[in-house]
Amino acid sequence: MIACGAARYALARGDRAEAAELWPLVEWCLEYCRRQLTADGVVASDTDELEGRFPTGDANLCTSTLYYDALLSAVSLGRELGVESAQTARYAAQARALARAIDAHFGGEVGGYDTYRYYAGNTLLRSWICMPLIVGLKERSEGTVRALLGPELMTDDGLLTQQGSSTFWDRSTLYALRGIFRAGYADKAGDFLHRFT
């Protein structure tokens, strides 16, 4: 999460000196995540944004998609900073491999939708299935958008954290909206937005 946030912050801020100061942190975090890759090529992690309030398995969709986005952001930031092209090419190759691993490990049918399992063995829809959409992974966008907007997750208050629960979180609702827009479903995202304004 730090690599993703720091790289995106540096790119948005546009301050070369500050970006150069943050670059070693980004590199360190990317290397840490790389060393946490499982045999399936996704990031091993026993926690996520919800800090243990819901099950996450040994590797979760949110952590791996944030690492994917961090790799892509580091490619852009590295190019801006004049980092050796071999390093940015390595990050780009790692991102491509991770995209394939995310689909292979997390992709599947959940609740009748062609979408993502939040972790291996998960059988309930989770609001954070929006994460691949946010980072530009579109292989399962149609099913994921349908799942996010379906009755299993959608409530008058926003998206449920997990199908069948009563917990919702504004952050995942806003992330889902962003992901639906990014996946190219502006009409559905617009309808979604109007429900909450």
Locate predicted features.
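Glycine-rich, acidic and aromatic/proline-enriched surface loops and short helix-turn segments
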Residues: I2, E31-A39, E139
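Hydrophobic or amphipathic alpha-helical targeting/insertion segments
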Residues: Y9-A12
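Short amphipathic coiled-coil heptad-repeat segments
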Residues: A101-F106
